[in-house]
């Protein structure tokens, strides 16, 4: 089932944590969940140029604390903190409670699955060849210490008439191993031919419950393409 299940949900409480941290009664839960989804969509549109990775939402005692993980925190904050104050006011209007916004810098954006997926989507919208964008992202991730990375693109690739999926992998990406630190994210590229979906898996090593540092594993040298395509040829 490791092939089918969401890699982050599969590893919750083992080496992954929740993106929303709050408790609500059965009556308030749907509304609060809807607010979380709307806030994430709003931040994705508003901060699309700021290389945003994760967004964590906490709700302590009639307030909200939103942590934005960004590779370009200066873009989010703005000159003298003007942009962050405007952003905070807009979030307070949406949530209806006082909001505290924290910005955390992503030290290695080349290893963040969400930033990688959004970067590839941005390149595809600028008519960059999908293979070139995927391989460039894989090379950058492996160069900066990833144990393995897998990227899949689905849709009308290069404008072909029939949609298909194509994936590449470098190193190893274990999907069944719970102690494996696998970062997973998806993104969409809106091209003139339609929407192209991108999925990214980044394997950073093995972790034991409560352990912070990853144990390096021996990477594979071969880069594989879809097995079905190879068999068909």
UniProtKB/Swiss-Prot annotation:
The keyword RNA-binding applies. One of its GO terms (biological process) is translation. The keyword Lyase does not apply. Residues 39-107 form the KH type-2 domain. GO terms for cellular component: cytosolic small ribosomal subunit. GO terms for molecular function: mRNA binding; rRNA binding; structural constituent of ribosome. Part of the 30S ribosomal subunit. Forms a tight complex with proteins S10 and S14. HAMAP family: Ribosomal_uS3_B (MF_01309_B). NCBIfam families: rpsC_bact. This is Small ribosomal subunit protein uS3. It comes from Chromobacterium violaceum (strain ATCC 12472 / DSM 30191 / JCM 1249 / CCUG 213 / NBRC 12614 / NCIMB 9131 / NCTC 9757 / MK).
């Amino acid at each position: 089932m490791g092939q089918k299940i969401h890699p982050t949900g599969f590893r919750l409480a083992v080496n992954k944590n929740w993106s929303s941290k709050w408790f609500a009664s059965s009556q308030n839960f749907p509304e609060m969940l809807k607010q979380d989804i709307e806030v994430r969509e709003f931040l994705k549109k508003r901060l699309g140029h700021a290389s945003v990775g994760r967004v964590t939402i906490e709700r302590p005692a009639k307030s909200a604390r939103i942590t934005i993980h960004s590779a370009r925190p200066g873009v989010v904050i703005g000159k003298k903190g003007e942009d962050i104050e405007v952003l905070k006011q807009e979030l307070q209007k949406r949530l209806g409670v006082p909001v505290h916004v924290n910005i955390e810098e992503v030290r290695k954006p080349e290893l963040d699955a969400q930033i990688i997926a959004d970067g590839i989507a941005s390149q595809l919208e600028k008519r960059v060849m999908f293979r070139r964008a995927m391989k460039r992202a894989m090379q950058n991730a492996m160069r900066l210490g990833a144990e393995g990375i897998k990227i899949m693109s689905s849709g009308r690739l290069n404008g072909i008439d029939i949609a298909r999926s194509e994936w590449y992998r470098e190193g190893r990406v274990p999907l069944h191993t719970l102690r494996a630190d696998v970062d997973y994210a998806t993104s969409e590229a809106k091209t003139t031919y339609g929407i192209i979906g991108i999925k990214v898996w980044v394997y950073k090593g093995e972790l034991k419950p409560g352990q912070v540092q990853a144990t390096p594993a021996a990477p594979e040298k071969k880069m594989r393409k879809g097995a079905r395509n190879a068999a068909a040829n």
